[in-house]
Amino acid sequence: HQPNQQVYARICKALGAEPPVNYVYELFLDQNGEKISKTKGNGISVEQWLSYAAPESLSLYNFQKPRTAKKLYFDVIPKAVDEYLTYVDSYHTQNVAEQIENPAWHIHAGNPPKDLTPISFALLTNLVSASNAETKELLWAFIGKYAPGTTPQTHPFLDKLTDYAIAYFNDFVKPTKQFRAATDEERAAFEDLIKRLDALPADITDGEAIQNEVYAVGKDHGFEPLRDWFKALYEVLFGVESGPRFGQFAAIFGVRETSALLKRGLAGELLKAA
């Protein structure tokens, strides 16, 4: 309709009416950058999206960059969820001018909620992977230790997020996981990390302190670039190439449990179970 905007405007003026304010937007593309069509069935329905994430995440996805042809496929869901959570959290620390520019202001009609969740969607999917959780009750056992006082009743959004994380993991992450064995260089670093984690208090929940230990191991063992060290952790332990901050995961999963997971990775147990 873009080429006809001027025609529409002239017709409105001829009839004595105010021309409409036009807004041009792009349609979605699939993961290969091709146009989505009903014939190909290469898109995502609203119902499918809402099986794995809250409606607000879809609102954010639609709100952002409407003039850009965005790729719409299942892999974008976790990012949309965590971006939504980031916007909601940041809203409450912003001044009025910044708040109005925040997508959360528009999604929630000027009144975004507070304290939705202390844990990101990406971390929850990793927690599902590491704990082999089939039900959200197991996830809540870890969450309760990490954030005492946090319950399904106090954080209903997080309760729904646990359901979404389990569903998304089972349908999209689990089928594509590719575990591998640690190399000799990585094995030495894993063993060092196990020792460092075992030296920390069992009830530590400071993700940054744990992250510093993980970072130090990578530096001490000469990983260059350092992201190769974190890539190795995720490939050996989770069967994926990347993920959220490892220290934060260990804080939620527990340092003793993370140490045990590292030992299983070294023993090849995760490779056998895949």
Predicted segment positions?
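N-terminal catalytic cores of NTP/NDP-binding nucleotidyl/phosphoryl-transfer enzymes
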Residues: H1-Q2
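Catalytic adenosine-cofactor/nucleotide-binding cores of aminoacyl-tRNA synthetases and other
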Residues: Q5, Y25-D163, F238-A273
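Short polybasic/polar patches that bind polyanions
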Residues: K13, S51, K219
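Secondary-structure transition/capping motifs at alpha-helix termini
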Residues: K13-P20, E224-P225
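Beta-sheet entry/capping signal
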Residues: P19-N22, E235
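Basic, alpha-helical terminal appendages of large translation-related enzymes
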Residues: W140-A274
